[in-house]
């Protein structure tokens, strides 16, 4: 934040914090004239409802674009803020000059935070969008026929080459912590944490025209998009 002249305040609360205690903090910052944007960092403790917490934020300061009001504006095609991950995906496609207009786009995952907003923004850009989810019977058939496949399901390396057509563009939004590395010397699994996406990167790499890595792909663009929403004047 400092590199672009933005002061960032990180308010850390205990894991046993109550909803009312968080609400008091958010309401205080809503009325602070020095604060232009507020986000709730996820995941939150299990006893708290993330969406209820988000809806405490003044929608004009909701730079993540996740409050009910901002989600409704997005659904109407008049977004105040494009949710950061969806915005980041579009910035990536724009930077690499990957066209969206008229393209077949499959979005795997329909969450409020990621899949839903991405599908909406892609539609606004003129793409032919199909959203796939756990109840979709022919997801692999749909994704194989798509020019762009965007994956956000929260399942490590779920998408392999059986889901991807030759020359497709793959955007992997997932980020998962997995453990385990086999050691022949010790003949056992060694607990070792690594981050992986929802796409089996090495399995599909040779058939795609472009793919985002995890980590280092969509994640940094999401952070950039938060700041872009912050410094861009909202309607």
Task: For the regions a language model picked out, list residue spans one by one.
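Short beta-strand elements in bilobed, periplasmic/extracellular small-molecule ligand-binding domains
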Residues: 1-15, 129-131
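Short, well-structured alpha-helical segments in soluble
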Residues: 21-33
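Short, high-confidence coil segments that cap the C-terminus of an alpha-helix
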Residues: 33-35, 146
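Rossmann-fold NAD(P)-binding glycine/threonine-rich loop
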Residues: 50-71, 174-235
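Glycine-rich phosphate/diphosphate-binding loop of Rossmann-like nucleotide-binding domains
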Residues: 15, 80-169, 173, 178-184, ...
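Anion-binding alpha/beta catalytic cores of soluble intermediary-metabolism enzymes, centered on
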Residues: 37-100
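Short, small-residue-enriched loops and turns at beta-alpha junctions
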Residues: 15-19, 45-47, 177
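Conserved beta-strand scaffold positions in the cores of enzyme catalytic domains, especially
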Residues: 5-10, 170, 210-211
């Amino acid at each position: 934040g400092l590199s672009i002249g933005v002061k960032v305040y990180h308010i850390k609360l205990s894991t046993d914090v109550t909803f009312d205690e968080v609400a008091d903090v958010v309401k205080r910052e809503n009325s602070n004239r020095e604060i232009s944007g507020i986000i709730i960092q996820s995941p939150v403790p299990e006893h708290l409802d993330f969406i209820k917490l988000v809806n405490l934020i003044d929608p004009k300061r909701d730079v993540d674009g996740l409050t009910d009001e901002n989600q409704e504006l997005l659904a109407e095609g008049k977004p105040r803020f494009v949710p950061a991950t969806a915005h980041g995906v579009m910035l990536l496609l724009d930077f690499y000059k990957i066209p969206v207009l008229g393209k077949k786009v499959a979005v795997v995952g329909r969450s409020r935070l990621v899949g839903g907003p991405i599908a909406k923004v892609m539609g606004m850009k003129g793409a032919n969008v199909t959203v796939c989810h756990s109840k979709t019977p022919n997801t692999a058939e749909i994704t194989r026929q798509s020019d762009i496949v965007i994956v956000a399901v929260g399942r490590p390396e779920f998408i392999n080459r059986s889901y991807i057509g030759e020359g497709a563009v793959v955007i992997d939004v997932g980020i998962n912590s997995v453990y385990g590395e086999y050691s022949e010397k010790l003949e056992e699994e060694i607990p070792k944490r690594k981050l992986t996406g929802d796409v089996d990167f090495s399995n599909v790499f040779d058939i795609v025209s472009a793919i985002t890595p995890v980590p280092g792909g969509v994640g940094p663009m999401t952070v950039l998009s938060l700041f872009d929403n912050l410094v861009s004047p909202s309607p």
